Amino acid sequence: MTLYSAALLLTTKLGPDGRHHRRHSTVGRGFHLQTAGVHHPNSGRSKYEVQVIAFSSELAIVSLPGEIFVELGLALKKASPFPHTFIAELANGSIGYVPNRSAYAEGNYEVVSARCAEGSGEMVVEGAVKLLKELR
């Protein structure tokens, strides 16, 4: 099964909170793919899909649709249960910059142009780590 065909198998469900939750898990030639995404229709929130792929008990890739700040990437790698965790940015689309919480006080270009609220970056890290732990 190709990564593309695995991604096409995603299902959509309406959760108890009224949000659409998509989650799929599959195993293919030497990898395990876990995908989760949340989208709240008519809320002004953006869809953000986090995808993790484990190739072994030692190696995982996290794909994110945006450019996360380095502090978030380092936090994700540190919290990952996989010794070798790689992050692919701008995967499955892009929502632009995803700053860490402390960057909002600085007001630099990336923060001003970001389409996500303060604290969103930390939520992305928490979600990715949760998915990684499910695979481990």
Where in the sequence are the language-model features?
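Non-catalytic substrate/cofactor recognition surfaces at enzyme active-site rims
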Residues: M1-R136
